[in-house]
Amino acid sequence: MRLLKTAFHPDISPADLFPEEILQEGLCPASNLKLIERHAARGIVVKGENILLLFTQRYHDYSLPGGGIDEGEDEIEGLIRELKEETGAAGVRNVKPFARYDEYRPWYKPDADVIHMISHCYTCEIDDELGDTAYESHEVSNGMKPVWMNIHVAIAHNEEVIANSEKKGLSIERETFMLKVIAAELVADMKREA
Protein backbone atom coordinates (compact mmCIF):
# COMPACT_ATOMS: atom_id res chain seq x y z
CA MET A 1 0.00 0.00 0.00
CA ARG A 2 1.45 3.37 -0.96
CA LEU A 3 2.46 5.71 1.84
CA LEU A 4 0.95 9.16 1.28
CA LYS A 5 2.38 11.01 4.24
CA THR A 6 4.19 10.69 7.55
CA ALA A 7 3.09 13.35 10.04
CA PHE A 8 4.80 14.31 13.28
CA HIS A 9 3.22 15.96 16.31
CA PRO A 10 5.08 19.21 17.14
CA ASP A 11 6.43 17.59 20.33
CA ILE A 12 8.00 14.72 18.39
CA SER A 13 11.20 15.41 16.46
CA PRO A 14 11.64 13.37 13.28
CA ALA A 15 15.38 13.39 14.03
CA ASP A 16 14.67 11.28 17.14
CA LEU A 17 12.94 8.54 15.16
CA PHE A 18 14.51 5.89 12.97
CA PRO A 19 11.64 3.54 11.99
CA GLU A 20 13.74 0.48 11.05
CA GLU A 21 15.45 0.46 14.44
CA ILE A 22 12.27 1.37 16.30
CA LEU A 23 10.37 -1.60 14.92
CA GLN A 24 13.17 -3.98 15.92
CA GLU A 25 13.96 -2.52 19.33
CA GLY A 26 10.82 -0.72 20.49
CA LEU A 27 12.91 2.34 21.38
CA CYS A 28 13.57 5.64 19.67
CA PRO A 29 17.38 5.35 19.61
CA ALA A 30 18.32 9.04 19.81
CA SER A 31 16.10 9.73 22.80
CA ASN A 32 15.35 6.35 24.40
CA LEU A 33 11.64 7.06 24.18
CA LYS A 34 9.45 3.98 24.36
CA LEU A 35 7.38 3.60 21.19
CA ILE A 36 4.29 1.54 20.44
CA GLU A 37 2.76 0.88 17.05
CA ARG A 38 -0.97 0.83 16.37
CA HIS A 39 -2.68 -0.09 13.12
CA ALA A 40 -6.05 1.28 12.03
CA ALA A 41 -8.31 0.55 9.07
CA ARG A 42 -10.34 3.36 7.49
CA GLY A 43 -13.08 3.04 4.90
CA ILE A 44 -13.56 5.19 1.81
CA VAL A 45 -17.11 4.85 0.47
CA VAL A 46 -17.81 7.27 -2.38
CA LYS A 47 -20.96 7.74 -4.48
CA GLY A 48 -20.41 10.51 -7.01
CA GLU A 49 -19.23 13.54 -5.03
CA ASN A 50 -20.74 12.21 -1.80
CA ILE A 51 -18.69 10.29 0.73
CA LEU A 52 -19.70 8.39 3.87
CA LEU A 53 -18.16 10.22 6.83
CA LEU A 54 -18.48 10.53 10.57
CA PHE A 55 -19.46 13.89 12.01
CA THR A 56 -18.27 14.40 15.58
CA GLN A 57 -20.18 17.13 17.41
CA ARG A 58 -17.50 17.62 20.11
CA TYR A 59 -14.81 18.48 17.57
CA HIS A 60 -17.22 19.75 14.90
CA ASP A 61 -15.37 17.84 12.18
CA TYR A 62 -15.76 15.17 9.53
CA SER A 63 -13.65 12.02 9.41
CA LEU A 64 -13.42 8.72 7.58
CA PRO A 65 -15.07 5.82 9.41
CA GLY A 66 -12.58 3.42 10.91
CA GLY A 67 -10.37 2.74 13.87
CA GLY A 68 -7.94 0.42 15.56
CA ILE A 69 -7.48 -3.13 14.35
CA ASP A 70 -8.15 -5.58 17.17
CA GLU A 71 -5.72 -8.34 18.10
CA GLY A 72 -6.31 -11.34 15.85
CA GLU A 73 -7.93 -9.29 13.08
CA ASP A 74 -6.41 -8.53 9.72
CA GLU A 75 -6.88 -5.11 8.13
CA ILE A 76 -9.95 -6.11 6.10
CA GLU A 77 -11.69 -7.73 9.08
CA GLY A 78 -10.99 -4.59 11.12
CA LEU A 79 -12.30 -2.39 8.32
CA ILE A 80 -15.56 -4.34 8.02
CA ARG A 81 -16.08 -4.35 11.81
CA GLU A 82 -15.36 -0.62 12.13
CA LEU A 83 -17.69 0.28 9.23
CA LYS A 84 -20.47 -1.77 10.85
CA GLU A 85 -19.90 -0.31 14.34
CA GLU A 86 -19.52 3.32 13.29
CA THR A 87 -21.92 3.63 10.35
CA GLY A 88 -24.16 0.55 10.42
CA ALA A 89 -22.77 -0.45 7.01
CA ALA A 90 -23.56 -3.94 5.75
CA GLY A 91 -22.57 -5.84 2.64
CA VAL A 92 -19.04 -4.44 2.55
CA ARG A 93 -17.54 -5.57 -0.74
CA ASN A 94 -15.10 -4.73 -3.51
CA VAL A 95 -12.49 -3.74 -0.92
CA LYS A 96 -9.32 -2.32 -2.49
CA PRO A 97 -6.22 -0.80 -0.89
CA PHE A 98 -5.98 2.95 -1.44
CA ALA A 99 -3.22 4.45 0.69
CA ARG A 100 -1.52 4.60 4.06
CA TYR A 101 -1.05 7.58 6.38
CA ASP A 102 1.46 7.41 9.27
CA GLU A 103 1.55 9.59 12.38
CA TYR A 104 3.91 9.93 15.32
CA ARG A 105 2.36 11.54 18.38
CA PRO A 106 2.88 11.59 22.15
CA TRP A 107 1.27 8.72 24.03
CA TYR A 108 -0.12 9.53 27.44
CA LYS A 109 -0.25 6.05 28.94
CA PRO A 110 2.50 4.45 31.03
CA ASP A 111 3.35 1.75 28.48
CA ALA A 112 4.96 4.16 25.97
CA ASP A 113 6.02 7.72 25.22
CA VAL A 114 5.28 7.82 21.48
CA ILE A 115 2.65 6.10 19.34
CA HIS A 116 3.23 5.33 15.69
CA MET A 117 -0.30 5.26 14.21
CA ILE A 118 -0.53 3.58 10.82
CA SER A 119 -3.84 4.18 9.04
CA HIS A 120 -4.57 1.71 6.23
CA CYS A 121 -7.24 3.26 3.99
CA TYR A 122 -9.39 1.12 1.70
CA THR A 123 -12.03 1.93 -0.88
CA CYS A 124 -15.12 -0.24 -0.77
CA GLU A 125 -18.80 -0.47 -1.58
CA ILE A 126 -21.62 -1.04 0.91
CA ASP A 127 -25.36 -1.73 0.82
CA ASP A 128 -27.50 1.37 0.30
CA GLU A 129 -29.23 1.19 3.69
CA LEU A 130 -27.24 1.91 6.85
CA GLY A 131 -28.24 -0.18 9.85
CA ASP A 132 -27.78 0.35 13.58
CA THR A 133 -24.45 1.58 14.90
CA ALA A 134 -22.59 0.15 17.90
CA TYR A 135 -20.66 3.11 19.29
CA GLU A 136 -18.28 2.95 22.22
CA SER A 137 -19.19 5.19 25.18
CA HIS A 138 -16.68 7.92 24.24
CA GLU A 139 -18.05 7.99 20.68
CA VAL A 140 -21.58 8.49 22.04
CA SER A 141 -20.47 11.25 24.43
CA ASN A 142 -18.57 12.96 21.57
CA GLY A 143 -21.75 13.04 19.49
CA MET A 144 -20.54 10.89 16.61
CA LYS A 145 -22.93 10.08 13.74
CA PRO A 146 -22.62 8.77 10.17
CA VAL A 147 -23.47 11.17 7.34
CA TRP A 148 -23.36 11.23 3.57
CA MET A 149 -21.67 14.50 2.70
CA ASN A 150 -20.45 16.24 -0.43
CA ILE A 151 -16.68 15.76 -0.20
CA HIS A 152 -15.89 19.35 -1.19
CA VAL A 153 -18.23 20.71 1.50
CA ALA A 154 -16.59 18.42 4.09
CA ILE A 155 -13.10 19.60 3.09
CA ALA A 156 -14.12 23.27 3.30
CA HIS A 157 -15.76 22.67 6.68
CA ASN A 158 -12.69 20.93 8.15
CA GLU A 159 -10.39 23.65 6.76
CA GLU A 160 -12.52 26.28 8.48
CA VAL A 161 -12.36 24.35 11.77
CA ILE A 162 -8.55 24.13 11.48
CA ALA A 163 -8.25 27.85 10.65
CA ASN A 164 -10.43 28.91 13.59
CA SER A 165 -9.14 26.51 16.24
CA GLU A 166 -6.29 27.12 18.64
CA LYS A 167 -5.77 23.35 18.88
CA LYS A 168 -4.01 21.99 15.84
CA GLY A 169 -4.91 18.31 16.11
CA LEU A 170 -3.22 15.72 13.94
CA SER A 171 -6.49 13.83 13.48
CA ILE A 172 -8.33 16.61 11.65
CA GLU A 173 -5.20 17.33 9.62
CA ARG A 174 -5.04 13.64 8.62
CA GLU A 175 -8.72 13.54 7.72
CA THR A 176 -8.60 16.75 5.68
CA PHE A 177 -5.45 15.63 3.86
CA MET A 178 -7.05 12.28 3.02
CA LEU A 179 -10.29 13.92 1.86
CA LYS A 180 -8.31 16.16 -0.50
CA VAL A 181 -6.48 13.17 -1.99
CA ILE A 182 -9.75 11.24 -2.34
CA ALA A 183 -11.38 14.23 -4.06
CA ALA A 184 -8.44 14.67 -6.42
CA GLU A 185 -8.01 11.00 -7.30
CA LEU A 186 -11.29 9.12 -6.83
CA VAL A 187 -13.99 11.74 -7.28
CA ALA A 188 -12.18 13.35 -10.21
CA ASP A 189 -11.75 9.89 -11.84
CA MET A 190 -15.48 9.18 -11.44
CA LYS A 191 -16.31 12.47 -13.16
CA ARG A 192 -14.00 11.64 -16.08
CA GLU A 193 -15.54 8.16 -16.44
CA ALA A 194 -19.13 9.48 -16.40
Regions found by a protein language model. Give the residues of each.
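Short, solvent-exposed loop/turn segments at secondary-structure junctions
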Residues: 35, 61-62, 103-106
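A generic structural micro-feature
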Residues: 35-37, 111-118, 138-143
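Nudix hydrolase/Nudix homology domain
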Residues: 131-194
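Conserved Nudix-box catalytic region and its N-terminal flanking loop in Nudix hydrolases
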Residues: 46-89
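Active-site-adjacent beta-strand/loop module that shapes the phosphate/pyrophosphate-binding cleft
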Residues: 103-133, 147
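Short loop segments at secondary-structure junctions
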Residues: 48-50, 125-130, 151-153
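A short coil-to-beta-strand element that immediately follows conserved catalytic motifs
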Residues: 90-100
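Acidic, metal-coordinating catalytic segment for phosphate/diphosphate chemistry
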Residues: 1-42, 48
